[in-house]
């Protein structure tokens, strides 16, 4: 299905055969380490894959209450979904105008610096406290003293052994390699940890193209 960012399939069948097919899949996959996964695990997998989630990482234009809540395909890295060669479609004129200029915002990947995080916790006598699941909250991102964007999803990747996040950043701060800071809460106090803009997806296995 692609939601995990890895090779996957959807199986559609009559409900009466669901248990039989499930048992067959589990039995056939046991030699390959097949394991059922719940939504918390899937949410981490989609984070590692750099996949955005509606109403978490972006707001639908149908639900946006103010213009600042809206995002265009160009700002979300989805310019490839807009075909301006088509003669007419709703919104074509606006898309054509936006395509002529650089997007004001970019949806990017962030990697939080482990040493920076470790230092913040060491200052209060603790080891880094890592989230057990992906978090979903608007979290400020800074360049020096200026807020230049906000992260929307993040968490510790057990696969990559890295603290990663997805974020909306102003175009001038969105280039891969840009050094920034992300807000973290350490013992109920707001701190800033160093973070770097990195290429999405975080995890991109060759096997998913099979």
Predicted features, each with a name:
Residues 1-210:
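Conserved, structured C-terminal
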């Amino acid at each position: 299905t692609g939601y995990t960012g890895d090779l996957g399939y959807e199986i559609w069948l009559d409900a009466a055969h669901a248990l039989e097919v499930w048992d067959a899949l589990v039995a056939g996959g046991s030699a390959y380490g097949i394991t059922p996964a719940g939504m918390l695990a899937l949410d981490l997998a989609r984070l590692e894959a750099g996949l955005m989630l509606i109403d978490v990482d972006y707001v639908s234009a149908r639900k946006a209450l103010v213009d600042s809540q809206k995002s265009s395909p160009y700002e979300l890295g989805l310019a490839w979904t807009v075909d301006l060669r088509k003669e007419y479609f709703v919104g074509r004129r606006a898309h054509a105008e936006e395509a002529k200029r650089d997007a004001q915002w970019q949806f990017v990947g962030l990697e939080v610096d482990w040493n920076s995080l470790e230092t913040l916790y060491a200052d209060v006598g603790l080891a880094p406290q890592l989230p057990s699941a992906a978090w979903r909250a608007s979290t400020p991102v800074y360049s020096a003293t200026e807020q230049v964007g906000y992260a929307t999803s993040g968490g510790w990747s057990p696969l990559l052994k890295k603290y990663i996040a997805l974020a909306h950043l102003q175009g001038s701060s969105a280039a891969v390699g840009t050094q920034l800071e992300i807000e973290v809460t350490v013992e109920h106090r707001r701190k800033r940890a160093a973070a770097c803009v990195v290429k999405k997806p975080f995890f991109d296995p060759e096997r998913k193209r099979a």
